[in-house]
């Protein structure tokens, strides 16, 4: 029974009714509110305490719950089972020992288990990016939720839309969903200094790439800097249209060497690996350069042109006739940009939300 009634005692006594009251009596210094658990949960905890020498830490040990639980937090809090609730109870009971500031904030301010996972997702939306603690909370939350599935992150993305001025600062590059949200924000609000912090890959893509080829270096630098920003913003300015018409009428691109000539210039093809990313253009050079630098690699770039029309069927002889033994063709970028199987349809969403997946293809390559 979970009720203890003592009649005719020699000393003052009180009545304990319900499992929570008994749990509170058994655990020294237990001050958690009864509302954080149901009667059934408290009863099961009481049963466990009676089997574990009335020691709550032994109960946590029984279910393999300790400070390492934070490393697999998604699994630990996803569900409504008794152990999931015990994880929440563990955090509430040990709140002062929590090292992750964001988790500590969420645990402190969450009153019941049912709201715990949602609060992990959305608590950051209540904090201004100007708050002196924001950056630390942002970074610690990012690590904390990195393994949560997109269906959980979607709750955060939706809640984060309420304040457009603040929302960009809270997004991360943990998931494709958030990366797309960054793109959508830019199409509506323009560029923000926050992009370099929240989405470094996009920032690297947008960096101005300085061409140093023998011909058209200035023109290519100007054109592709202009082009990339408009691609992300999903708009075309009149000035850019004039620039396109100017270059198209002058046929200045014909001054560049052909791709086939660049391939032929490789002296020892047996020591080279031909890696063809179909639909890869010079717009990605700033991003590719950043990736190479990050990996400690050196990079040499020759700027060339393909034959017109630029469809793959007309521009693949360099690959088919490659004299070296090692080659590979990556088609996913072309699928994303040009084909239905890439999964992006302008009729479904006019925003350029395909850009994050384009960058992911290049990163994996």
Segments from the language model and where they lie:
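…; additionally, a secondary subgroup of soluble metalloenzymes is captured
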Residues: 1-272, 279-365
């Amino acid at each position: 029974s979970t009720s203890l009634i003592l009649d005719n005692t020699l000393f003052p006594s009180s009545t304990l009714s319900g499992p929570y009251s008994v749990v509170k009596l058994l655990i020294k210094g237990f001050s958690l509110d009864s509302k954080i658990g149901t009667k059934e949960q408290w009863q099961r905890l009481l049963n466990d305490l009676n089997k574990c020498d009335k020691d709550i830490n032994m109960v946590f040990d029984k279910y393999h719950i300790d400070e390492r639980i934070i490393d697999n937090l998604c699994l630990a809090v996803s569900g409504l089972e008794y152990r999931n609730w015990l994880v929440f109870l563990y955090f509430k009971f040990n709140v002062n020992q929590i090292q992750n500031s964001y988790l500590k904030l969420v645990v402190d301010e969450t009153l019941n288990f049912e709201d715990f996972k949602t609060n992990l997702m959305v608590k950051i939306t209540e904090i201004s990016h100007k708050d002196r603690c924001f950056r630390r909370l942002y970074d610690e939350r990012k690590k904390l939720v990195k393994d949560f599935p997109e269906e959980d992150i979607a709750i955060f993305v939706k809640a984060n839309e309420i304040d457009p001025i603040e929302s960009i600062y809270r997004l991360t590059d943990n998931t494709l969903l958030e990366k797309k949200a960054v793109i959508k924000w830019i199409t509506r609000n323009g560029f923000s200094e926050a992009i370099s912090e929240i989405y470094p890959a996009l920032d690297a893509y947008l960096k101005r790439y300085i061409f140093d080829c023998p011909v058209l270096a200035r023109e290519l630098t100007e054109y592709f800097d202009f082009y990339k920003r408009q691609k992300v913003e999903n708009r075309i300015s009149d000035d850019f249209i004039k620039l396109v018409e100017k270059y198209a009428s002058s046929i200045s691109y014909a001054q560049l060497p052909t791709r086939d000539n660049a391939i032929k210039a490789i002296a020892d093809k047996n020591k080279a690996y031909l890696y063809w990313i179909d639909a890869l253009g010079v717009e990605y050079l700033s991003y590719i350069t950043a990736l190479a630098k990050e990996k400690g690699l050196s990079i040499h770039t020759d700027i060339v042109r393909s034959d017109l029309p630029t469809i793959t069927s007309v521009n693949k002889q360099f690959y088919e006739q490659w004299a070296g033994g090692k080659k590979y063709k990556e088609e996913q970028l072309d699928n994303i940009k040009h084909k239905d199987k890439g999964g992006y349809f302008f009729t479904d969403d006019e925003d350029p939300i395909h850009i994050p997946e384009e960058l992911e293809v290049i990163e994996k390559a």
